[in-house]
């Protein structure tokens, strides 16, 4: 199995290759004077099984993925791992005339099989023109929290939609878990608090699949601290963290931010490489 890392996932590809006892394939990435992307696979892959690992947080990264798939023509098998898939949040029409961007992107990516990691909406997998599997990094996040030294942490989902992820993170560790609920007290007064459990005197870990602007999370952090939490930590799979999101969160009182390397950020403290490697070993 040859591992090829795209420009957005160089470290993750290297870690995955190491977990499989091999080295990543060498590639050249450059840009033409007009800004167009140039890439070349420098190693021989003819009749080999290859796996491309490339997140697509930007349009350019998506183009790079398409180019890498095309450059692998002649390989015996082409697997594609998209650790973080951009445009996945536009999985339905919110207004008449809109594009379902996740569907449009998925339809363009064809390979022997595709792997995603905690994709925002699982129904997107049905739009790929080939078999697609979603891997769950929840156990990795749970293991990290268990080894972090936090005493009796409480895991909290920011909304009902993230409850499934929080339950999976807590599984096998006995962590208490709950989700936040908004209660409108008046026309302009809304209180955010845990639905069932009291956060007073607890180390709280807010868990979600991704953190983007951090606005909602920052408000939740302030509320939890005001309600008596000792401290509030954030854990996510995908650290999108646009613009000044990290600064906004720390200003709100977050103790720390824990994320995986589906996107390579300063907050990427744990790697999904073992998860990818295990999936590839099963092929």
From Swiss-Prot:
Catalytic activity, reaction form: D-ribose 5-phosphate + ATP = 5-phospho-alpha-D-ribose 1-diphosphate + AMP + H(+)
Signal peptide: none
Pfam families for the chain: Pribosyltran, Pribosyltran_N
An example Gene Ontology molecular-function term: ribose phosphate diphosphokinase activity
Any one GO BP annotation for this protein: purine nucleotide biosynthetic process
UniProt KW Acyltransferase keyword: no
Swiss-Prot/TrEMBL cofactor(s): Mg(2+)
Biochemical pathway: Metabolic intermediate biosynthesis; 5-phospho-alpha-D-ribose 1-diphosphate biosynthesis; 5-phospho-alpha-D-ribose 1-diphosphate from D-ribose 5-phosphate (route I): step 1/1
Stated role: Involved in the biosynthesis of the central metabolite phospho-alpha-D-ribosyl-1-pyrophosphate (PRPP) via the transfer of pyrophosphoryl group from ATP to 1-hydroxyl of ribose-5-phosphate (Rib-5-P).
Record-stated family: Belongs to the ribose-phosphate pyrophosphokinase family. Class III (archaeal) subfamily.
PANTHER family: RIBOSE-PHOSPHATE DIPHOSPHOKINASE FAMILY MEMBER (PTHR10210), RIBOSE-PHOSPHATE PYROPHOSPHOKINASE 2 (PTHR10210:SF32)
Name this polypeptide is given: Ribose-phosphate pyrophosphokinase
Organism: Methanosarcina acetivorans (strain ATCC 35395 / DSM 2834 / JCM 12185 / C2A)
Gene: prs
